[in-house]
Amino acid sequence: MSSLQRSAPASQNVSLPLEQVKEALGEVLNALQSPTGSARLEEARENSGNDLGKVLQLLLPAAVQIQQEVLQNYGFSPDGEGVLRFARLVKSYESQDPEIAAMSSKLKSFFLPPLPLPPHAGLSAPSS
């Protein structure tokens, strides 16, 4: 097993350089888009409908589990805490690297359903 794939104790903070974060993020996205990952997420989406509560109960845990399976290969604990630590690490690199920012945005789209724009009732367009 390479040093990249050693598991870190859950209490250990994992720090990866930018390129490894990009690699891990790419693997997470690939896992979510794989036939198996897509099927798991689609089933959760169908069972959730447009109910945000059900999205949190069904879709979010499925997506987190898929991430855990990848992130443990990068030394993160295979639990929700490992996913949160990775999310914080990604966030710290978003402003430094536009590719990481774009990949992070794509990752978030797996968790959050598209929200409709709120109506702008009572607001009129400025007159010229």
UniProtKB/Swiss-Prot annotation:
One of its GO terms (cellular component) is cytoplasm. Transmembrane segments: none annotated. Its main location: cytoplasm. InterPro entries: P_C10 (IPR026317). The keyword Cell inner membrane does not apply. It is found in: Cytoplasm. Belongs to the UPF0456 family. This is Protein C10. It comes from Xenopus tropicalis (Western clawed frog).
